Amino acid sequence: MLDRGCPDCGFDPDYDVTSTGERARATVERWAAVLDRLGMTDRPRPGTWSPLEYACHVRDLCRVFRERLRLMLDEQDPVFADWDQDAAAVEGQYNLQDPYEVSGELAQEVRATADAFDAVTGEQWARTGRRGDGKDFTVASFAAYFLHDVEHHLRVDVRG
């Protein structure tokens, strides 16, 4: 996805990364509308998350990405702790959470993460970090990875 874009959602990784925060914030109202629908806990097919579960995932993803961004800015080439998103969904009982609470929490987390990316300047965009599986990121590529996740889940997975 970071090399050629996403054919499913149309994400182009060659966007201006300084707009990451603005674009992330632009999803908040659409996520709120998704969580206001009937059937938000319905899974479209076995093994596929419901809209509520995707919203919980994006909320938690924001927390994880914000912490990883902080590490990239504060440390030299940090290695990120693993995050098992499927285990997080089970442990957090995503599909049993209150959609109105999730909506507020998601908005807060998206905005906080957007603010964190807004604070990145100049040479900080070139700082590096790595996932436990060895995948390397710069802050710029990490921003694109984050934004793609948020926008893809909204456009493709929950049709928001």
List each model region and its residues.
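Hydrophobic alpha-helical segments and helix-packing faces
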Residues: V17-T20, A24, G47-P51, V58, ...
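Short amphipathic alpha-helical segments at helix-loop
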Residues: D12-D16, S50, E91-D98, G134-T138
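Short, contiguous alpha-helical
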Residues: M1-D3, M40-A89, E123-G160
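Terminal targeting/low-complexity segments that flank the catalytic cores of oxidoreductases
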Residues: M1-A26
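Acidic/histidine-rich alpha-helical segments that form the ligand environment
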Residues: A24-T27, W31-V34, A88-R127, F146
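A glycine-rich, hydrophobic loop/mini-helix early in the fold
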Residues: E22-W49
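General structural signal for secondary-structure boundaries
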Residues: Y15-T20, L35-L38, D84, Q97-D98, ...
